[in-house]
Each structure stands twice: as structure tokens, then as C-alpha cells.
Amino acid sequence: MESRRSANYQASIWDDNFIQSLASPYAGEKYAEKAEKLKTEVKTMIDQTRDELKQLELIDNLQRLGICHHFQDLTKKILQKIYGEERNGDHQHYKEKGLHFTALRFRILRQDGYHVPQDVFSSFMNKAGDFEESLSKDTKGLVSLYEASYLSMEGETILDMAKDFSSHHLHKMVEDATDKRVANQIIHSLEMPLHRRVQKLEAIWFIQFYECGSDANPTLVELAKLDFNMVQATYQEELKRLSRWYEETGLQEKLSFARHRLAEAFLWSMGIIPEGHFGYGRMHLMKIGAYITLLDDIYDVYGTLEELQVLTEIIERWDINLLDQLPEYMQIFFLYMFNSTNELAYEILRDQGINVISNLKGLWVELSQCYFKEATWFHNGYTPTTEEYLNVACISASGPVILFSGYFTTTNPINKHELQSLERHAHSLSMILRLADDLGTSSDEMKRGDVPKAIQCFMNDTGCCEEEARQHVKRLIDAEWKKMNKDILMEKPFKNFCPTAMNLGRISMSFYEHGDGYGGPHSDTKKKMVSLFVQPMNITI
């Protein structure tokens, strides 16, 4: 009889009793009324801001405080006007405006999908084609340049140089800094650029940072804190409902060998779909995340190769009449996943008149096939080439399932042309998730004897050391972000889903930046979840 492996996963610290104890007063009507009054004041503030730099800085603050979505109509008009004043081919005037203005304008516009050329920075370069050394003392300008460089696309060498130049001088500034606030700002940027950060987590940091500044606007601070607390109250109610649902499934008892990461799965879904009004999509995505985790552990840890082959065939046929061919734990999992998938397809058919069951089924089939391929590699002791591994692993990372599920539950009406675009881009979008996961979990998973990851495959291909392989994977991540900047930000293949698609990369970077933030109770992940779901912002009303 084939022995079963055990990953010895630690139990989640987020049990149902704790989750049900979460409570917030910020769902009350008086807070909603106060928020509306503050929004009116901010709208007036936006209307009265005329200077171009002040407008850009205000929009930047609104975005980082997490409240810009309340004023999108106003901010979009401002950005259209600013972009419309572009002087074709004349970049010298940017030097007069300064590096901070030029870089901030570049980043804010590119974030919104405007085709701002990298040549706007040419006026800050000398005849040799290097950035002028006189810029090395411009702290604000360098931070803005560094942040802007992460909006680059493939082949934009000026922005590559901008990243290297600003990074070099910002690291030196941190070493020599006497102003703690300035040092903290630089360190924050260097740890993770703004373009790759999770919106809600950035808001937590930036509210505290901005509030302590001499130029902080108290109305913006109050609205940001109040809005955060109100959305947190929404998250708490969703999390409590999901925890009750998970308890009722009995999956934790029946699949005791697996990771049961309800709160962590909710953090994933929140990172991808943060908007308070998208609760339906967020909760469905969390359920799907829970199923993915269980299926992953069945293939990676517990199932025998013979059982996994039968499970894969039954998922391919999508036929519950074949359940008796499976052991009990697989029957329970498949039936629950099967019913939930069909239920989601029914709700979409009922509400939108479009049948997506074949799409949803196809995603689970593709995922299970890739899981089975990796299981056969493990059982045969086979190390794939890096290319062979990534072709399978970008799917087994579960990005396509997450992206399509997110699209189906946040988009109305569902557009067939957008679905075709998502099919073209899903694997590439999933690659950042896979590579970030491998960087964070590779060491732990190799200790468990899992299939080699990108790092080990590249080491096997080239004979390089682990650190060189890690640097290679980081370069691959950078390349995928550049591709996403072009394919998603600039080309806008989806009317409203582009930010959500980009968010998959952001939450991936967040979860795995300090190791495996999902597989086990992790101090960094715990800190993030407490800030997002438990602790409200201090505010006096």
C-alpha cells in the first residue's frame, strides 16, 4: 500500500469563534452621513485646485489614501486636461517644471492608461545619455522617478536607466539620512514600489505617514480613516458569513490533512477585489480560493498517484455518477466543488442570461491536469526544464481560475470579446503569481520533497547557485510586470476589469515577499490581516 505524505501544516489562528467575535460600529448610518459631508468638502477642494502640480499631488494623495474612487469623474477630467496639454516632441519644458513634476505626471497618467512617452525624461539626461548627477540630491524627484520607472514597458531603456539611477542614489540617501520621515518614505519605496502594492495595505501605511506631515489636509485624513473603517466593517460581516459557511461544509474535519486558510483566502480575494460594493465577487472568490487550496493539497500531499489519476479523469468528465470510483475524502471534495461551480454558473445564467458552465468546468479541468502533471514529475523523480516547468506551473498557480472567476462575479454584462482577451492574457497574468510563490515557498516545499520549483529547475538547467537562480526569477517577474503594463494598462482589453487583473500580481507580491505567507501562520500575514480586518483607524467624530 502506497504511503501518504504529510506536510504538517499548522492550524490557522483564525478560528470561527474569533472571526464571529469581530464587531464594528462603523456600519451605522451616522458614519455614512458624515462620510457624505466629507466627500462634498473634498469635491470642493478638487474643483478649487488649479495648479497642475497641486492637482497631480492631490490625485496621488487621494489614490494612496484609498479614497480616489469616490471622485473618479472629477479626477478623470483633470487627467484628460493634463494629458491634452502635452507638447508633442517638446520635452525641454519638463526640465523647467522639475523632475518631481515630470515623474509624478508620468506615473499618474500611465496608471490611468495614457500613452506618455519615456522621452519626457530626456531633458534630465546629459549628452552621454546618462541622468545628470545634479539630480542626485533631489530627494522628492528621485522618489518620484523611482516610482515612475515601474510603469515601464518592454524596450523602454530610459526607464530602466531611471530605475537604476534613482535606486542607487536613494540607497545612499537612506545611509546618510538625518530626517527620519524622509528615510521612512525612501525605505518604503525601495521595499516595494507603489505600482506593485496592494491598495488597502498601502492606505494603512500612507494614512499614518501623510497624517504626520506638515502639509496634511485634515479633511482628507478624516475621510480616509472613516472610509477605511466603514469598508472594514463590510469585510468583517463578509468574513463572518464565510466562516459560518465553511464550518457548515465539514471540509475541515473531512480533509484534516489540508491547509484550512479561510481568513488568508479572504485576504487574497480582498487584494484582488477590494471595492466595498463588490462583496458578491469577493465572497465567491474566497470560496474558490478555499477549493483551490484543498485541491492543491490533495495533489501535492495526500493523494496517491492512482487516486489522482482517477480524480483528474472524473473532473475532466464532470460527472458525479462516477463518484464511487473515488475514496471518501475525494468524493466529499469533488461533490462540494462540483455543486458550488454549478451554483455560480446558475446565478450568472439567471442574472445575465449567459451560460458559463463550460468556461468554469474548463478552468478546473486545466488546473487538475497541471496538478496531475506535477504529481507525476514528483513520483517519477523528474526535474523538468525551466520552460517545461513554467508552461505547467503558470496554470497550477491557479491564476486562470482566479481571474475568470473574478471577471464573472464583478462584470455585468459579461462581454464575449473581453472573455477572449482574458483567455489570451490569463496565463501571462498568472506568471507573476507563480514566480512570486516560488520565491517565497521554494525552500519550505523542497524540504517537504515537493516537485522542483522555478529556482531548482533553473539551477538544474544552468548549474548556477541558488542566489543566481533567485535573481533570474526576479528578472522574470520584472519582465512580466512590463508585459502587463503594456497588455493591460495601455491596451485596456477590458472595460472595467483591468485594475482587478493587475491586482492578482499585487496580492501575489504581498503574500510572498517575506516567505510563505499562505501555507503557515506567518507573522507578516497576520499583521496585515489584523490591520485590515480587526483594528479600526483611530478617529474622533
Curated annotation (Swiss-Prot):
Asked whether the keyword Lyase is assigned, the reply is: yes
Q: What is this protein called?
A: Alpha-zingiberene synthase
Q: Give the catalysed reaction(s), semicolon-separated.
A: (2E,6E)-farnesyl diphosphate = alpha-zingiberene + diphosphate
Q: State a single Gene Ontology molecular function.
A: terpene synthase activity
What does the record list as GO biological process? diterpenoid biosynthetic process
Per the annotation, the residue ranges of the short sequence motif DDXXD motif are 296-300
Q: Give the note describing cofactor binding and stoichiometry.
A: Binds 3 Mg(2+) or Mn(2+) ions per subunit.
* Cofactor or coenzyme needed: Mg(2+); Mn(2+)
Which PANTHER family does this chain map to? (-)-ALPHA-TERPINEOL SYNTHASE-LIKE (PTHR31225:SF256), OS04G0344100 PROTEIN-RELATED (PTHR31225)
Residues the record lists as binding Mg(2+) 3: 437, 441, 445
Q: Which organism is it from?
A: Ocimum basilicum
Q: Where does Mg(2+) 2 bind?
A: 296, 300
- Family, as annotated: Belongs to the terpene synthase family.
Keywords recorded for this protein, A-Z: Lyase, Magnesium, Metal-binding
Give binding positions for Mg(2+) 1: 296, 300
State the function annotated in the UniProt record.
Sesquiterpene synthase that catalyzes the formation of alpha-zingiberene and other sesquiterpenes from trans,trans-farnesyl diphosphate (FPP). May have an additional monoterpene synthase activity.
Tree of life domain = Eukaryota
